[in-house]
Amino acid sequence: MTPILDFEKPIVNLKEKIVELKSFTENSEIDLTKEIETLEERLARLEEDIYGNLKPWNRVQMARHPDRPTTMDYIERIFTDFIEFHGDRFYGEDEAIISGIGYYKDSPVTVIGHQRGKDTKENIRRNFGMPHPEGYRKALRHMQQAEKFNRPIITFIDTKGAYPGKAAEERGQSEAIAKNLMEMAGLQVPIICIVIGEGGSGGALGLGVGNHIHMLENSTYSVISPEGAAAILWKDSTQAKKAAETMKITAPDLKELGIIDQVISEPRGGAHRDVDSQAELIDNIIKQSLVELMLLSSEELVDKRWEKYKQMGTFMS
């Protein structure tokens, strides 16, 4: 059963009441058709009111939903003949990042993304989508290979952050992320980055330097989690909801600030409600981006990417 978020409970309660009335009607001689139709109209209005007016904290909850589609869900639906590569050729394999090659509309591309698990066992194996340095080095190796063979790069971002453990730090976590930022800025192929869940801090940025940055409607992208920000600002992590309201971490806010290029719509109730439809919406955005970026020369791709990031954070008084 799909977990229910707290703000969705009025919708679920009304749906249960409709099901109850339908069952009663089928098993009795009393016709409640009009009452059911009235409740269904009320349900439609309620869904529109709740899902159409989500607060930042609600979007954080949606981004963290345990059933939210992962990178692999989209790879299976958008790309063909995908072959995953493994290892960074320095230390080992990191299953928190998936990286490989495949075809998009009959054209070869390199696809890289954070990968969470679907259950406890897989989450432990994939370290809950929090990469070690070898994950970022693996990704960079494949991005450099993409440049060598002139393949566009598409990345899917979905991580709470890079793994902060002692072993990861000893193996150069910060250096691995920093090198990815530097190298991605200068790669002479199109790079499209899509935030599909949580885009947490440097762990997200390690796959997030691109020509086009897109976000799903209910994803988040921030330098720190709302809980972390609340702990720093108010010494109280339970103030996360308040922090989320002020941090500007949602797709609509980041689009307005010029951090991202497009907000990708989600099916009503979130991407997990209809993965196929969500994949189709992402597919359309990838197609639009590639059509635009493939017209640019390698020099123009790099120049526009540099210009994009140089303008971030500027403002006029």
From Swiss-Prot:
Signal peptide bounds: none
Predominant location: cytoplasm
UniProt-listed Enzyme Commission number(s): 2.1.3.15
Designated gene of the protein: accA
UniProt-listed InterPro entries: Acetyl_CoA_COase_a_su, ClpP/crotonase-like_dom_sf, COA_CT_C
Lineage: Bacteria, Bacillati, Bacillota, Bacilli, Bacillales
GO terms assigned for molecular function: acetyl-CoA carboxylase activity; ATP binding; carboxyl- or carbamoyltransferase activity
Coiled coil: none
Recorded superkingdom: Bacteria
SUPFAM superfamilies: ClpP/crotonase (SSF52096)
Record's keyword terms, sorted: ATP-binding, Cytoplasm, Fatty acid biosynthesis, Fatty acid metabolism, Lipid biosynthesis, Lipid metabolism, Nucleotide-binding, Transferase
One GO location term (cellular component): acetyl-CoA carboxylase complex
Protein name: Acetyl-coenzyme A carboxylase carboxyl transferase subunit alpha
Family the UniProt entry places it in: Belongs to the AccA family.
Reactions that this protein is recorded to catalyse: N(6)-carboxybiotinyl-L-lysyl-[protein] + acetyl-CoA = N(6)-biotinyl-L-lysyl-[protein] + malonyl-CoA
Oxidoreductase in keyword set: no
Function per UniProt: Component of the acetyl coenzyme A carboxylase (ACC) complex. First, biotin carboxylase catalyzes the carboxylation of biotin on its carrier protein (BCCP) and then the CO(2) group is transferred by the carboxyltransferase to acetyl-CoA to form malonyl-CoA.
